[in-house]
Amino acid sequence: MSDMYTKHAKRYDAVAQSNIYNALLERPSTIALLSPLSEKTVLDMGCGSGIYAQYFLTQNVNYLTCIDASSEMIELVKAKHGSNVNAYVQDLSQGLPQEPDNLYDAIICPLVLHYLEDLPALFQEAYRVLKKGGYMVFSMHHPFADFECSVTGNYYEREQIEEEWDTVGEPVTVRFYRRSLTEITEALNAAGFVISRLTEGVVAKEAKQISPETYERLSRNPNFIFIRCEK
């Protein structure tokens, strides 16, 4: 796991509240795929510092579980939301061993899956814990956007990419997996999911006032992909 989400957890939380990529592109594009959540059971899978949890609690959810591999992030969630959420540390590469079958109406998994090598295993676990008629919404790096980082030059070959990001104000090493759209959709199909929506998101116009250059780039080039799939 990158130091971004452990050592720099508090700084990442502060930045993610309002930066263009999270607040003005990823979150509104993900939320647009959700059905009304009032009285629903929700699993925030890869919850980070609890920014989505804050939104869910305003929607009058019946029960909210927040899990993340970073203990530092989970501590932030507990500090913010206390007993309003069931928050605990869980490495998603190990599945969802603490979660029972058929519990959740909705699962959200924002900007997490590109850090995991084995998508089929996690999708099978997500399918297991969803109620019949439930759904999962997730966002991840767009396959096209990541291909420019490819070392092999083979779009269809999964590969691990290493970059340095300055999200928290200093360079931090981040490693993630680049994979084809086919690999993503086939893993969903194999788990039993049916894809009902697939979008590339829309950057909010407010971003233009913050950084015209970034707004222009995100308006012309895909950065994330957003998928809703049904059980």
Give the location of each predicted region.
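Class I SAM-dependent methyltransferase SAM/SAH-binding core
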Residues: 43-45, 49-96
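A short acidic, Gly/Pro-enriched loop at the edge of an enzyme's catalytic core
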Residues: 97-107
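A short SAM/SAH-binding and catalytic strip from SAM-dependent methyltransferases
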Residues: 105-119
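A short glycine-rich, Lys/Arg-flanked "PGG" loop and its adjoining helix->strand segment in the class I
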Residues: 120-135
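Acceptor-substrate binding/catalytic loop of class I
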Residues: 138-140, 144, 168-183
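Short alpha-helix
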Residues: 175-199
